Amino acid sequence: MSGVTVSGDGIVTGNTYDKYGSSNPVVRRLMAAFERDLDELFDLAAPSSVLDVGCGEGVLVQRWAERLGEGRVVGIDLEEESIQAGWAERQAPNLEYRVMEAGRADRVENLPFAEDEFDLASAIEVLEHVPDPEHTVSEMARCARRHLLVSVPREPLWRMLNMARGAYWSALGNTPGHLNHWSRRSFVKLLSSHGDVAEVRSPFPWTMLLVRL
């Protein structure tokens, strides 16, 4: 299943292709490498509580809630019918979902959590969609006391791959909703201003970082 999701405020939140549940063998191979690196970095962070910003339909937060047992896991995302439908299907006793206030069209407002409320704050395939990624990362760092775990598409590779498969030619291969584009080096530079980049992984075609605060 795929499509373009637009929030109630008219914000394109991206292509909603279900990469975690895809039956395509190529996608499955790419996602296996992605999830392996993600699991390894999550284990290195060893959190007892997690905030996932832009949690989507709840695939990852449900997994993390099961892994943490009684540890608190909170997923937050925009109000959108398909997202909340996913939340209804993915529940756990220690898992909580919150609807994010979109605020003005040019930025995402402050996260509704206290300073150092979580061990880990994550944004997995999210920062490319937000109008002000610097503000979003700053808010994540405020809410987390130990680590950030983040991933984004690696550019210009991502757009080149889109064009190679004949997708989004009119946008030069840019996926709908992708407002920001980072090479591995430029993404490391962005996150380095918020903490020590402890691990950098490059599962094709993404960049994934674990940042120590």
Describe each region flagged by the PLM.
Residues 122:
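A conserved beta-strand element that flanks and buttresses the S-adenosyl-L-methionine
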Residues 126:
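Hydrophobic adenine-recognition pocket in adenosine-nucleotide-binding enzymes
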Residues 129:
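Histidine-centered divalent metal-coordination motifs
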Residues 1-114, 137, 164-195, 199-213:
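Conserved N-terminal segment of class I S-adenosyl-L-methionine
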Residues 149-171:
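Conserved class I S-adenosyl-L-methionine
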Residues 134-148:
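A short glycine-rich, Lys/Arg-flanked "PGG" loop and its adjoining helix->strand segment in the class I
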